[in-house]
A protein has these predicted regions:
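Beta-strand-rich interaction surfaces with strong enrichment in secreted/lumenal proteins
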Residues: 13-16, 79-86
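C-terminal, structured domain-capping segment
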Residues: 22-38, 88-141
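Intrinsically disordered, low-complexity regions
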Residues: 7, 47, 51, 62-65, ...
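Generic "edge-of-domain/loop-turn" microfeature
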Residues: 3-5, 17-19, 35-37, 47-54, ...
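Beta-sheet-dominated interaction scaffolds and their linkers
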Residues: 1-27
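Polar/charged alpha-helical tracts
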Residues: 15, 52, 56, 62-70, ...
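A surface/secretory-pathway sequence property marking extracellular, secreted
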Residues: 1-3, 41-81
Length: 141
């Protein structure tokens, strides 16, 4: 029967973010051993950036992904190598990457967020600066 859904969760923890940080990269490979192609969907189900819980602020997964593109001096992106994972052993890669160049082009934002990131990490040494939980679903089609 079609329509079966498989779900996996990716937990992303970036200890410290700061201008000039080493780029962060994490990936999850999902394979499809079934006999039916599946559609891959990813959704941010929890997001915490420097102590701000974005889900608690009422942001949707799409809001959060767009916010990562537009609202911060660092870049954080989530992508999938394909929207469809073919039957009989095909593989798809979900990638999470983050970076913060020394010169993002906006010194004021770099300074503001740099200070925030520094203070957060100093005050919360045991907590990740960025923590995400991403649900990846493979839905047979």
């Amino acid at each position: 029967g079609g329509g079966e859904t498989t779900e996996e969760y990716i937990e992303v923890n970036i200890d410290a973010i700061y201008p000039g940080m080493q780029p962060f990269y994490q990936e999850l490979k999902a394979s499809n051993d079934g006999e039916t192609d599946a559609k891959i969907i990813y959704e941010v189900v929890d997001a915490n950036v420097l102590g701000d819980n974005l889900i608690a602020k009422g942001m949707s997964s799409l809001d959060i992904i767009n916010s990562f593109k537009n609202d911060y001096p660092f870049t954080l992106s989530i992508s999938s190598s394909s929207d469809i994972i073919k039957a009989n052993g095909d593989e798809v890669t979900i990638s999470i990457s983050a970076s913060w160049d020394y010169d993002s082009g906006n010194d004021e934002e770099d300074t503001k967020w740099g200070n925030r990131a520094y203070d957060y990490h100093k005050d919360n040494p045991d907590l990740s600066s960025v923590k995400l939980l991403i649900k990846v679903s493979a839905i047979q089609i």
